[in-house]
Design a protein with these regions (language model features):
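Structured-RNA-binding interfaces characteristic of tRNA pseudouridine synthases
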Residues: 1-261
Length: 261
């Protein structure tokens, strides 16, 4: 038996999320990958992913593993999969790893990036990958609000409504808000995230950037442990799973270069 790790990228616009769903609920990343891998390995395949992205959310660097008794060389998997999965999903890399390596146990953290088009006029060329916010955002206030979320907290306030039970205590290591013209990004690194947590962070920071909420109220929102005290969840299309960190060194490199930590 062999254990294979694959790196996957996908445009989530037309997908029903990462996690496999009943057939009548649309294509999923997990379902498509398992179908394709079963074809090229000539046996049923079950994959395990590091992050369960929602419907409409994208990924540049999703990590999955699967075990197989098949003989296909790992380096041939990305090319072999092209014929068996939708064009919205691409296997970037495949490597053989120790049998005991599991994606949820052997990672140090994740980075998500939320993208906003901040201009009165929409951009039809990138609308699949951003949230269009028409009114000007105060980037400095958004960064100040993000700084209030750093550290280890109970993030119940920022979890999705009707989400499955999970430990709400998470650690946010870095938040960086940046604007280049009308292109605004909210980058977040943490040890793990609750359902809808990053999208709720984006929605909260946008409310601050628009003057609807105050930086000094952020700690109070967290202390309330109540989803109802914050606004709407930011739309899915602006969110992308940017990277999953296998090593502490790689995570620290990103934190130093992008987050100045």
């Amino acid at each position: 038996m062999r254990n294979i790790r694959i790196i996957v990228a996908y445009d989530g616009t037309d997908l029903a999320g990462y996690q496999k769903q009943p057939n009548d609920k649309g294509l999923t990343v997990q379902g498509c990958l398992e179908y394709g891998l079963s074809k090229i390995c000539n046996e049923p395949i079950q994959i395990y992913g590091a992050s369960r992205t929602d419907a409409g959310v994208h990924a540049k660097f999703q990590v999955c593993t699967f075990q197989t008794s098949g003989s296909i060389p790992a380096e041939n998997i990305p090319r072999a999969m092209i014929a068996h999965i939708p064009k919205d999903i691409v296997v970037l890399e495949a490597v053989e790893i120790p049998l005991d390596w599991k994606p949820r146990w052997n990672i140090y953290g994740k980075e998500y990036v939320y993208t906003i088009h901040n201009q009165l006029i929409a951009n039809p060329l990138t609308k699949r990958y951003h949230w269009h916010v028409k009114k000007p955002l105060n980037i400095d206030l958004m960064q100040a609000a993000g700084n209030e979320l750093l550290g280890t907290h109970d993030f119940t306030t920022l979890k999705g409504t009707n989400s499955t039970p999970a430990d709400p205590v998470k650690t946010i290591i870095g938040i960086h808000v940046e604007a280049e013209g009308s292109h605004v990004t909210i980058s977040v690194v943490g040890d793990g995230f609750l359902y809808h947590m990053v999208r709720n962070i984006a929605g909260l920071l946008v409310d601050v950037g628009l003057g609807r909420r105050k930086v000094e109220d952020i700690k109070g929102y967290l202390a309330a442990k109540d989803r109802r005290v914050i606004g709407k969840t930011a739309p899915a299309q602006g969110l992308c799973l940017e990277e999953i960190f296998f090593t502490e060194e790689r995570q620290q490199e990103v934190l130093q270069n992008k987050y100045s930590i």
